[in-house]
Amino acid sequence: MSVRYAGLLLAAVAVSAHINEVNSIVFPGSLHIDNRNGHVQRDLRSADNGNEERNAILETLSNHLASAFGYLWTKEAQEMTNSAWSALRNKESSLPLYSEGVAREYIETAALNTLTAEHRLARAEAYMVSMIVALRGVENPESLRNSADNLQQFLINVWKTGKKQPAQVFELLEHVPYEEGNASLVNDSKFAIWMAYMGKTFDHQFKNWADVQHNEQLRIEGDKEKKGGPDYVEGTESRGKKRGQTEAPDLEPGLTPKQKRLKRMELQRVKKILLNINLMGIGRS
């Protein structure tokens, strides 16, 4: 599995419309993102002329890149990724899982899921899987163990304290030995750290996201029970309330009931994928 291939996915999931500190991000040799107008320039064919299937996947990622703008991680997604990072340094991790076919399947799924705005958590899934693929994709992962340990600790500190700036981590990465294939890993890691920093910075916007989803589910189920069946469509009738009962405020008024329902479904899908990875011995910290 090419480290550079995984890095292209990192570029897609790491860029946010909320990045105000920079106007342009360049991923060497393949992708240029101009944050000022959302314009994406790509020359993917030149990156790997001999692999049409891979180019087709990269083309899909590039085409849907703009749809991923503006959707940030939830705190839960950061914690799940943190757990995966810890597992990466476990010598007992099941290396055969990271075959090119399995990695391609995950990446294709994540790329398609970022097409719809309500699938914000798919970005976290794509990030986690692509980082695993990137680290396992080098010829000799053991040669990167010390640098990866330091990199992991920096990432954890970014999530927990928010005090470390990306530039500090970039400086650390300059000490990663440039063995064959490692240059791409360094670039991939820079995108990963930038995303971790931005995710921490804007985490307050979604700190109550899980509670909102839970309360919304309870409300919809209660409405269906009142109206007498599963075919009840929210919004077609006024909701009856008992004396003294107040209606919970809609904390996501910009989303339709269908979008909220899809968001809940996506959360469950991602949890199931992560659980399967955990059962395979990958997600143990």
UniProtKB/Swiss-Prot annotation:
A motif (RxLR-dEER) lies at residues 42-54. Residues 220-229 have a biased composition (Basic and acidic residues). It is found in: Secreted; Host nucleus. Its main location: secreted. Glycans are attached at residues 182, 187. Transmembrane segments: none annotated. GO terms for cellular component: extracellular region; host cell nucleus. The keyword Transferase does not apply. Keywords: Glycoprotein, Host nucleus, Secreted, Signal. Disulfide bonds: none annotated. Belongs to the RxLR effector family. Has the canonical translocation RxLR motif, but lacks the canonical EER motif, which characterizes most oomycete effectors identified so far. The C-terminal 58 amino acids (residues 228-285) are required for RCD1-binding and attenuation of light and defense signaling. This is Secreted RxLR effector protein 106. It comes from Hyaloperonospora arabidopsidis (strain Emoy2). The gene is RXL106.
